């Protein structure tokens, strides 16, 4: 199947109570904090970054709305994430999630446990590639490496061969219509003892292809698992990235210029398709550079008439959202303006405040500086204004 014809949906199973993960007062394990964020928040963030178009349904317990709502608000995914109430068993919860996606015209669906927060994008890509090659169902799994024993009460009865044995993981991925039909058939037959979705697929005769799982993709089951996950994230190396941007616009006769979103009266204006705010254009490029998301022209082509005369804050706020959707936190924004006139000093504080508002970061993290070009070159001849911008962004850490 061609990639352009594939449309994935995601079911995140999060309705469990997690009795083995500690006392009820600590709350369900999917909402316990690890690395400063809830387990499920890490999980959802990975899928949001992997595919910015696929719908996600979170199957949650009826009592967990107050826990889930603030997490969804922080992720700011809008209508991409919906919720549905789960059933008494995992099997019933998955079926509820699949039914909730029925209006999206999906070709495939990934079903993932919320308490596997370390799922990686490369695994999701491998799964998608197998579907493109024709696989109906895909199961990430690891070969069993421990010696297996069968026991009776407190005695070993026999050693079980581990040849051909695998430990199943999630996400388990399928043709959407096939796995929906399989779950419906299982429910209609009264069979409720399936422990994963691949088992249901096998029961209905669907072929499931194995792909390599990951030792990092652990399921947080016990209280000590959550403690280890928190320790792992707490000792992660910070992924600090720096992006640079440069822009220049010509000056022409006019009544003022807009720089960093602030209009300054002047006997010239900047020439451009939008409002020609050279500072915000440079900073937009700097932010996009931190996550390899192209440049301002890729997102807002100057050939598109809808951006004619547009306020450049639209571009900057979009770039900030792209950064956050990729798991980034903007730490600092620095803009250097190069112009003979107008004077920037009297407006610097207003510019910093505008940047702080547009980026949603503290004022102390926003810097605006200005210099002349000592009457040299096109800037020195007052033919244009240039801007250099640097953005510092911290992305989710890499575990040691």
UniProtKB/Swiss-Prot annotation:
In Swiss-Prot or TrEMBL terms, this protein is called: Bifunctional enzyme IspD/IspF
State the Gene Ontology BP annotations: isopentenyl diphosphate biosynthetic process, methylerythritol 4-phosphate pathway; terpenoid biosynthetic process
Q: In UniProt terms, what function does this protein have? A: Bifunctional enzyme that catalyzes the formation of 4-diphosphocytidyl-2-C-methyl-D-erythritol from CTP and 2-C-methyl-D-erythritol 4-phosphate (MEP) (IspD), and catalyzes the conversion of 4-diphosphocytidyl-2-C-methyl-D-erythritol 2-phosphate (CDP-ME2P) to 2-C-methyl-D-erythritol 2,4-cyclodiphosphate (ME-CPP) with a corresponding release of cytidine 5-monophosphate (CMP) (IspF).
EC nos: 2.7.7.60, 4.6.1.12
Region named 2-C-methyl-D-erythritol 4-phosphate cytidylyltransferase? 1-240
Which PANTHER family is this protein grouped with?
2-C-METHYL-D-ERYTHRITOL 2,4-CYCLODIPHOSPHATE SYNTHASE, CHLOROPLASTIC (PTHR43181:SF1)
* Family named by the database record: In the N-terminal section; belongs to the IspD/TarI cytidylyltransferase family. IspD subfamily. In the C-terminal section; belongs to the IspF family.
Please list the residues that bind a divalent metal cation: 247, 249, 281
Annotated keywords: Isoprene biosynthesis, Lyase, Metal-binding, Multifunctional enzyme, Nucleotidyltransferase, Transferase
**Transmembrane stretches, start-end:** none
Region 2-C-methyl-D-erythritol 2,4-cyclodiphosphate synthase: start and end of each range?
Answer: 241-400
Question: Per UniProt, what is one Pfam family of this protein?
Answer: IspD
- Species of origin reads Agrobacterium fabrum (strain C58 / ATCC 33970)
Q: Name one GO molecular function term.
A: 2-C-methyl-D-erythritol 2,4-cyclodiphosphate synthase activity
């Amino acid at each position: 199947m061609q990639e352009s014809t594939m449309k994935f949906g995601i079911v995140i199973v999060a309705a469990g109570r997690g009795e083995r993960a500690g006392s009820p007062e600590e709350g369900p394990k999917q909402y316990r904090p690890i690395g400063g964020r809830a387990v499920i928040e890490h999980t959802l963030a990975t899928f949001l970054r992997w595919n910015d178009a696929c719908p996600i349904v979170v199957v949650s317990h009826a009592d967990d709305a107050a826990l889930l709502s603030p997490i969804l608000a922080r992720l700011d995914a809008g209508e991409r994430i919906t919720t549905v109430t789960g059933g008494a068993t995992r099997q019933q919860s998955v079926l509820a999630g699949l039914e909730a996606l029925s209006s999206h015209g999906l070709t495939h669906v990934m079903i993932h446990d919320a308490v596997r927060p370390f799922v990686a994008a490369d695994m999701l890509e491998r799964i998608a590639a197998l579907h493109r090659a024709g696989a109906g169902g895909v199961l990430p799994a690891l070969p069993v490496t421990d010696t297996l024993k069968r026991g009776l009460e407190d005695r070993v009865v026999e050693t079980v061969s581990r040849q051909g044995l695998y430990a199943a993981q999630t996400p388990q991925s399928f043709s959407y219509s096939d796995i929906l039909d399989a779950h419906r058939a299982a429910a209609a037959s009264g069979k409720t003892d399936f422990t994963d979705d691949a088992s249901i697929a096998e029961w209905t005769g669907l072929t499931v292809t194995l792909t390599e799982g990951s030792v990092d993709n652990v399921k947080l089951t016990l209280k000590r698992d959550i403690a280890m996950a928190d320790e792992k994230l707490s000792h992660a190396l910070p992924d600090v990235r720096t992006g640079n941007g440069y822009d220049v616009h010509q000056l022409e006769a006019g009544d003022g210029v807009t720089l960093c979103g602030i209009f300054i009266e002047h006997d010239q204006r900047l020439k451009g398709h939008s409002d020609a705010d050279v500072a915000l254009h440079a900073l937009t490029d700097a932010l996009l550079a931190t996550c390899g998301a192209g440049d301002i022209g890729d997102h807002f082509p100057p050939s598109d008439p809808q951006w004619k005369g547009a306020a450049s804050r639209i571009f900057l706020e979009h770039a900030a959202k792209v950064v956050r959707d990729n798991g980034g936190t903007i730490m600092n924004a620095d803009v250097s303006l190069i112009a003979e006139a107008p004077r920037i000093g009297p407006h610097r504080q207003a510019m910093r405040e505008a940047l702080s508002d547009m980026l949603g970061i503290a004022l102390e993290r926003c810097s605006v500086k200005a210099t002349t070009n000592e009457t040299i070159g096109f800037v020195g001849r007052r033919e244009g204004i240039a801007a250099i911008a640097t953005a510092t962004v911290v992305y989710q850490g890499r575990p040691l």
